[in-house]
Each structure stands twice: as structure tokens, then as C-alpha cells.
Amino acid sequence: MFAQDAAQTGEQTTQNQGENGNNFVTEAITNYLIDDFEFANTWQASMPRDYGVVSIIRREGGPADVVAEGAENNKYILGAKVEYFRTGYPWFSVTPPRPVKIPGYTKELSVWVAGRNHNNRMSFYVYDVNGKPQAVGNEALNFMGWKNITVQIPANIRQEEFRGQVEQGISFMGIHVKVDPRDSYGKYYIYFDQLMAKTDMYLETYREEDDPLDTW
């Protein structure tokens, strides 16, 4: 399912000990479920046509840690299969049917990945608060089995706009994989589960509800 709140939510208040010792920073950290891939067949995949074809599948399975948390609600994963036509520097991406708006100020993105020990690298693609596309992370996929990949959102990706009343935060666009030319032959398989965001909901919680949004 898309964009559901996970169970773990907590508000944290920390004190910045400045000269007066009375500067407080408040955070309301939430683990936000972007997609659990129970409807993975609604996703799409793409790659340059002259390098090969990529297809996706919804199939049963998942990392043991995730399945153990709720077997009835965590039955399916997203799988992608690439069939290369020739070697080179191709890429492929998997994307949801539409961008997913993540509420609040996103601290990090994470996803469980089942790798096949290829030298490929993975990034998240997002829109910033102004709709500008951005790539986040450059994570190695040279491992076997399931691994939870977590990427911090850098400060240079704009998530707040205080000169108008707009929806704050970023939107998730998809997962992008750059293929190492040494591995761009034959077939390649990769699987994903439990796409999450760790987000600070403080700004959303304390936004004035009667202030209209500048989204028209």
C-alpha cells in the first residue's frame, strides 16, 4: 500500500545550550511508510531501449525481519529483471504510478534490497519543495541477499518554503540504478521491500489549519 504512517511515532525535545541555555529545538519524528509493495504490480520500470529491456513483478517473499513483524500484511515484494542487449553504461529505474508526497521534513529514506553481488549503484529520486528533481545517494549493490539501505537527505535539497503557504517537504519519484559496464550482460535481478522515510512532522503539526495553501 502507498504512503501509510508506520506505527512508530515520537516527539523529541532537545535543548541547545547557548549563552542563555534556553534555546529549544522540537522534533516530532515519524517512520513514514511510502510503500510496502503489496500492490507492486502498479509500479513501472524503464531503461534505454538500445541497452535492453526491464520488467517488474509482484511476488511473495521479503526479508525475515520485515515478514516477522506482520506476515499477513507483508506478503509481497517488488522484483525487477533486466535483460541486456549489449554492454555499456545503461541505467534503469522503478517508479510508483505517481509521485508520493512525504509529509514533514524528511531526514532519511530507506528500502530493503535483495542484491545479486553486481557492481551497480542505487539512488533515490525525489522532487524538492519547488518541484525540482534531485538524486539522493549513490549506494553500492555489491552484496547478496537482503540488506536495508538507508540514505540521509542532504541539507542542500530544499524542503521548506516560508515565503508562501505551500506543502512542505519532498516527493518520492522512484529508485534509479546505474549499471556497471562490467556487469551489463545477460540478466540481472533485484528485489525491493518496505520503502520508508524518517520524517520530522513538527512543521506539519503546528501549521495553522485555516491558512490556505498556495497550490492552485
From Swiss-Prot:
Start-end of Low complexity biased regions: 8-22
Gene Ontology CC: one annotated term: periplasmic flagellum
Practical applications: Has shown promise in a 4-component vaccine with BHWA1_00430 (AC C0QY54), SecA (AC C0QZS7) and BHWA1_00569 (AC C0QYX7).
InterPro entries named in the record: FlaA
Superkingdom to which the source organism belongs: Bacteria
Subcellular location: Periplasmic flagellum; Periplasm
Keyword terms: Bacterial flagellum, Periplasm
A Pfam family it matches: FlaA
GO BP terms, alphabetized: bacterial-type flagellum-dependent cell motility
Chief place of localization: periplasm
Claim: Membrane is one of the keywords in the record: no
Ranges for region Disordered: 1-22
Function, in words: Might be part of the flagella.
The name this protein goes by in its record: Putative flagellar filament outer layer-like protein
Species for this entry: Brachyspira hyodysenteriae (strain ATCC 49526 / WA1)
Lineage, broadest ranks: Bacteria, Pseudomonadati, Spirochaetota, Spirochaetia, Brachyspirales
